[in-house]
């Protein structure tokens, strides 16, 4: 049976030629439909993101009375001047060091694993990706509490070292415990972008490099690493940003001995009732995160 092709009606073609307004009206109608479809999302982002952000910025310029009340009159920069206090600088440096250490360790652990996944057969890739996503099947708070038990003074790690004749290892409420918790919590955020970059890579370029007598290290340094760099940058941003403002993990695994930016900001809002200073701290942290996001978009990692 011969195939019949659908041809436009000549009458419609003539009508469109004689009435150019029809095409314009169609575009306007389509644009209006797009606006209506996106309206709930815009309302949600405005109410739960943009409006709270504006409130935080406004409160950062407010004044705090002697009774702990926040006054929106007489705006000043006192809260921002306090950001340069030695205590705040110490907490900020500690938070930055832990966030950078978390990012570097996640990268060192994730790259070989992502490389291994990307070089497997498709059926094994899916299974290995499921293993990466398994931690997300349970609550983050529950998983962090599990590390609290493991690293505790009576936990399995301490009992194991004691049974081997060594001093029991007590890592709970230390920077090491926080680092372990952060690496465990954010490791998948590094694996997935790296896998996406490596999986989309043209592996024939690696084969060509080997054919030109490049050893494994040279092929990796000249071909694999540059092509996977967008995934490295994307994963680093996805790990660094939440690590810098982490609150749950430092609170549960670090305790009162270690104060990071997330804990300090919460204490200013709740315990100290100093909302202007807490808002200024939040704006400062968001500014650092904004710089990281700008680096992310300018790096070309957005193409992942």
Language-model segments: which ranges?
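Transmembrane alpha-helices
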Residues: 39-51, 130, 134, 184, ...
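Short membrane-interfacial helix/loop motifs at transmembrane-helix boundaries
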Residues: 50-88, 150, 154-155, 255-256, ...
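C-terminal transmembrane helix and the adjacent membrane-cytosol boundary/short C-terminal tail
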Residues: 2-20, 25, 195-206, 210, ...
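Glycine-rich helix-loop "coupling/hinge" segments at transmembrane-helix boundaries
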Residues: 67-72, 149, 247-275
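Transmembrane-helix boundary motif in ABC transporter permease subunits
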Residues: 29, 101-133, 149, 203-206, ...
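Hydrophobic alpha-helical transmembrane segments of polytopic membrane proteins
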Residues: 178-181, 237, 260-296
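N-terminal signal-anchor/first transmembrane alpha helix
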Residues: 8-16, 20-56, 126
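Membrane-interfacial helix termini and adjacent extracytoplasmic/periplasmic loops
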Residues: 23-27, 71, 77, 144-183, ...
């Amino acid at each position: 049976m011969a195939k019949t092709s659908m041809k436009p009606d000549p009458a419609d073609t003539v009508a469109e030629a004689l009435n150019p307004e029809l095409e314009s009206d169609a575009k306007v109608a389509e644009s209006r439909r797009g606006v209506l479809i996106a309206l709930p999302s815009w309302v949600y982002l405005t109410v739960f993101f943009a409006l709270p952000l504006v409130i935080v910025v406004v409160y950062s310029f407010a004044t705090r009375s002697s009774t702990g009340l926040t006054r929106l009159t007489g705006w000043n920069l006192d809260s921002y001047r306090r950001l340069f206090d030695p205590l705040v600088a110490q907490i900020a440096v500690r938070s930055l060091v832990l966030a950078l250490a978390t990012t570097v360790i996640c990268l060192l652990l994730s790259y070989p694993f992502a490389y291994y996944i990307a070089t497997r057969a498709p059926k094994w890739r899916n299974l290995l990706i499921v293993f990466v996503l398994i931690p997300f099947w349970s609550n983050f708070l529950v998983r962090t509490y599990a590390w609290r038990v493991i690293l505790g003074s009576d936990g399995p790690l301490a009992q194991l070292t004691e049974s081997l004749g060594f001093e029991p290892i007590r890592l709970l409420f230390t920077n090491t415990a926080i680092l372990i918790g952060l690496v465990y919590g954010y490791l998948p955020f590094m694996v997935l972008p790296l896998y996406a970059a490596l999986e989309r890579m043209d592996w024939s370029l690696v084969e060509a490099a080997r054919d030109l007598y490049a050893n494994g290290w040279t092929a990796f340094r000249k071909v694999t690493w540059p092509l996977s760099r967008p995934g490295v940058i994307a994963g680093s941003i996805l790990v660094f940003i939440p690590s810098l403002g982490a609150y749950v993990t430092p609170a549960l695994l670090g305790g009162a001995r270690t104060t990071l930016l997330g804990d300090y900001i919460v204490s200013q809002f709740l315990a100290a009732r100093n909302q202007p200073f807490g808002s200024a701290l939040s704006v400062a942290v968001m500014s650092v995160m904004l710089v990281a996001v700008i680096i992310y978009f300018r790096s070309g990692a957005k193409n992942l």
